[in-house]
Amino acid sequence: MESVDQSCSVPPGFRFHPTDEELVGYYLRKKVASQKIDLDVIRDIDLYRIEPWDLQESCRIGYEERNEWYFFSHKDKKYPTGTRTNRATMAGFWKATGRDKAVYDKSKLIGMRKTLVFYKGRAPNGQKTDWIMHEYRLESDENAPPQEEGWVVCRAFKKKPMTGQAKNTETWSSSYFYDELPSGVRSVTEPLNYVSKQKQNVFAQDLMFKQELEGSDIGLNFIHCDQFIQLPQLESPSLPLTKRPVSLTSITSLEKNKNIYKRHLIEEDVSFNALISSGNKDKKKKKTSVMTTDWRALDKFVASQLMSQEDGVSGFGGHHEEDNNKIGHYNNEESNNKGSVETASSTLLSDREEENRFISGLLCSNLDYDLYRDLHV
């Protein structure tokens, strides 16, 4: 077979992964202009006489297994007087889906790309398959009507089957998703996608390994040692953190503890206020006692003065000795009264010192109480 013979012409390790710009700007443009292609690896295929599952042998490049195949095809009209393209085969037909996408070379429009899906049977009762094809045509005006005749270059591939959880979402093959991106970005995203997939696989294996270790009873004695139990548990970034369920009993216990703490603070406030009020009462009592002692001393002094005056009036003209005795007695009384006043003033000073010490003690206890409240709130 000619295609099989030509497949051996490429050197070992040859890979053919052209971009959209390369397919349209180089291969298709040279094909339409009948110019020689340096390495002619794209076959001419009559798309209407071959089934998609036969493209693997007809479009083989070298001996490497491939998941996408390239070929040139010439479009023909379905009807001689119509405008529709004939895309029917013996087993089914190719149906266009979605809108055509523009292919740019830098900022210049060079072509359009159409996406088609292969259906088995005949319309409208065809059965959809996993075969996808991208059809490229030359175009210089994006709004121009599509050309229904002429050469096109095609890329055909099969969508990967969905397995497991992937059945919930429709997953296209890597080549299909790769071609949906802008052609200038594909060369950058391909290695990044590979690296991200490798990281995801390593993460999944690590997670499964850790879960198996946690589920199995290893029986290591050093894990159950007290010194290891007292250590804080380290959080692993690779494992998802699970939230502990909060029960109603835990919530009620927290509320009870909160109420008890509030009552404790209120009792402390009441006791502190009572202490301050009792201190004020003691101060008042001391002041009243000092004042009473002072007034008693003054009363004695005044009474002695009055008595001395009465004695002087009644005994005026008496003996000189009695006057001297009265004067001495008066002097003694006066000295006694002075001593009582001095003692009263000394008691006042001592009371003021005690009051200052009491106030300073209260201030210190108040500061300690505020610190205690700040630490326990």
Curated annotation (Swiss-Prot):
UniProt subunit comment: Interacts with NAC030/VND7.
GO cellular component, one term: nucleus
DNA-binding region as annotated in the record: 110-165
Principal localisation: nucleus
Organism classification: Eukaryota, Viridiplantae, Streptophyta, Embryophyta, Tracheophyta
Residue span, NAC domain: 10-159
Comment field on protein domains: The NAC domain includes a DNA binding domain and a dimerization domain.
Function recorded in the entry: Transcription activator that binds to the secondary wall NAC binding element (SNBE), 5'-(T/A)NN(C/T)(T/C/G)TNNNNNNNA(A/C)GN(A/C/T)(A/T)-3', in the promoter of target genes. Involved in xylem formation by promoting the expression of secondary wall-associated transcription factors and of genes involved in secondary wall biosynthesis and programmed cell death, genes driven by the secondary wall NAC binding element (SNBE). Triggers thickening of secondary walls.
Compositionally biased tracts (Polar residues): 337-347
GO function term, MF aspect, one: DNA-binding transcription factor activity
Compositional bias of kind Basic and acidic residues: 318-336
Region of interest (Disordered), ranges: 312-347
Signal peptide: none
Tissue: Detected in root protoxylem and metaxylem poles and in vessels of protoxylems, outermost metaxylems, inner metaxylems, shoots and hypocotyls. Expressed in roots, hypocotyls, cotyledons and leaves. Present in developing xylems. Specifically expressed in vessels but not in interfascicular fibers in stems.
Compartments where located: Nucleus
GO BP annotation list: cell wall organization; positive regulation of secondary cell wall biogenesis; regulation of DNA-templated transcription; xylem vessel member cell differentiation
Keywords: Activator, Cell wall biogenesis/degradation, Developmental protein, DNA-binding, Nucleus, Transcription, Transcription regulation
InterPro entries cross-referenced by the UniProt entry: NAC-dom (IPR003441), NAC_dom_sf (IPR036093)
Family membership noted in the UniProt record: Belongs to the plant vascular related NAC-domain protein family.
Protein name as it appears in the record: NAC domain-containing protein 76
UniProt entry tagged with the keyword Calcium: no
